[in-house]
A protein has these predicted regions:
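PP2C/PPM-type serine/threonine phosphatase catalytic domain
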Residues: 1-139
Length: 139
């Protein structure tokens, strides 16, 4: 599998995007994109902590029997790791948004939190786009 990465900080002073990816058994693959939350402390560290802990959890616990459950457990684990990181550096609040993809021979599984989107294209046309988790969308 060939992976390309691109990140653009836009009008921000600091780029708090982080991408982590790796191989899984049976030609599977995991890819996570995180972006530190503006207005919170150490967004870059939050993004890295969450992405790396999700990737490691999925790689260490991967089975093809219940991938959605493994993804949920990985997100919970990453939140625990983020809280430990927050305490270790003395930050008041840390957070990030995330988008993730797990690919197997048969399926692609996605999950996301916040306003980072996942798009699916078929024959050059957008056929699916995740909906942002935001206060406006919840109203």
């Amino acid at each position: 599998m060939i992976i390309y990465e691109y990140s653009n900080k836009g009008c921000r002073v600091e780029n708090q995007d982080y991408i982590s990816h790796g191989s899984l058994p049976d030609d599977g693959y995991v890819c996570i994109l995180t972006d530190g939350m503006g207005g919170y402390s150490a967004g870059d560290e939050a993004a890295k902590t969450v992405a790396e802990s999700i990737r490691a959890y999925i790689q260490n616990n991967y089975t093809q029997t219940n991938i959605p459950n493994i993804i949920n457990e990985a997100i919970t684990y990453s939140n625990d790791e983020l809280m430990l990181k927050r305490l270790s550096i003395g930050a008041q609040r840390m957070g990030c948004v995330l988008a993730l993809l797990v690919v197997t021979k048969e399926y692609a599984y996605i999950d996301w939190l916040g306003d980072s989107r996942v798009y699916m294209f078929r024959n050059g046309k957008e056929v699916y786009r995740t909906e942002d988790h935001s206060m406006i969308n919840e109203m």
